């Protein structure tokens, strides 16, 4: 009888942890989807998210005097935040903008175009003389490939990667899709 109660208590803790970790993971992904402009999908996800939240909270609220259950709930939250951020990283939704400043005027833009990237370039004046500024928009999931390519083609280039929350027109890479 005592063993059955211990197993039930351990199972309760596991359920609290998993429900909370799942809720926070889903919450994190939903917020990213919302920020990326996918309102309808984010709204649909929120329905299931709230069910998880109410369920996990209900398991703990009735027993707030049990510090182990409260700690398990908090641990589920922390793990859920980590898992949610990893899921979001793997989904890599959206686009990134690379702004590249190079001294290799006339060399880097054609090389990037040969790799299927859309590049807009212009001449600029820097502290140390003439530079070329390149602007490249890519899918976020292809961002690491673009970074590796830039490092390979011009290790001395100054590169800034920005989140491109919206774009219209232009040429988005064909090869790296």
Swiss-Prot record:
Subcellular location: Cell membrane
Domain of life from the UniProt record: Bacteria
A GO CC annotation given for this chain: plasma membrane
Membrane topology, record value: Multi-pass membrane protein
Main location: membrane
Sequence intervals crossing the membrane: 9-29, 41-61
Gene3D superfamilies tied to this protein: 3.30.70.120
Key words of the record: Cell membrane, Membrane, Transmembrane, Transmembrane helix
Family: Belongs to the UPF0316 family.
Database matches in HAMAP family: UPF0316
Annotated protein name in UniProt: UPF0316 protein STH2077
Organism annotation: Symbiobacterium thermophilum (strain DSM 24528 / JCM 14929 / IAM 14863 / T)
């Amino acid at each position: 009888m005592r063993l059955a109660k211990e197993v039930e208590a351990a199972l309760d803790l596991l359920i609290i942890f998993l429900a909370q970790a799942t809720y926070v993971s889903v919450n994190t992904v939903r917020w990213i989807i919302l920020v990326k402009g996918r309102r309808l999908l984010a709204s649909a996800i929120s329905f299931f998210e709230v069910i998880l939240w109410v369920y996990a909270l209900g398991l703990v609220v009735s027993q707030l005097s049990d510090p182990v259950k409260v700690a398990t709930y908090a641990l589920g939250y922390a793990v859920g935040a980590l898992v949610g951020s990893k899921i979001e990283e793997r989904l890599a939704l959206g686009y990134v903008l690379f702004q590249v400043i190079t001294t290799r005027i006339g060399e880097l833009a054609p090389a990037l175009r040969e790799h299927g990237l859309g590049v807009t370039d212009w001449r600029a004046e820097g502290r140390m003389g003439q530079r070329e500024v390149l602007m490249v928009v890519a899918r976020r999931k292809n961002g690491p490939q673009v970074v590796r390519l830039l490092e390979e083609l011009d290790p001395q280039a100054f590169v800034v990667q920005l989140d491109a929350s919206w774009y219209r027109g232009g040429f988005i890479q064909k090869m790296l899709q």
